[in-house]
Amino acid sequence: MFKSKCLLLFSLACVLFLSGCATDLPRFGFRGKATGPAHFTIDLSDQKACLYRGRTVVFQCHVSTGREGYDTPAGKYHVQQKDLDHRSTVYGAYCLPNRRIVVPDVDVRKNKKPPGTVFIGAPMPYFLRLKGAVGMHAGHVPGYPASHGCIRLPNSAARRFYDAAVVGTPVLIKR
């Protein structure tokens, strides 16, 4: 009985302690009744994206930007293209016609296509093209820069940014 009470008290203390470590990011979703055109900021140092309406941050989330050697370029951009079901033309896998993967994690500029295979581009849902091959899209967000230069967002967040964007939406990427 004493052990179970101690375990319960220890568990509660851990929960209270860890709740103080919670991130200051708001929950996924829009806050308030902010109006005005949307614009986005991407903070490469903090690995964070913010969606603004006017001057108010209405949504923010963690992101994963370009890893070493594939840096996401800082600068001022505008959404050039929206593609709900985009696939990469550079990164993906070489597969047999039945879609069985033969060579994963392919860069078509560096990896020669084996005979009898087809290239299947990596899926990039909710794609917003910013510059050339750089864009924002849903993808794995491990908590550090890990992409080939794009800005990866959690799936639910990518949808929020996609829905808020129009071609021409300003995007500031800062260090």
Per-segment meaning from a language model:
Residues 84-86, 133:
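Short, charged/polar surface micro-motifs in flexible loops or helix N-caps
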Residues 21-80, 87, 101, 174-175:
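Intrinsically disordered, low-complexity
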Residues 21-33, 74, 92-175:
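Exported/periplasmic cell-wall-interacting domains
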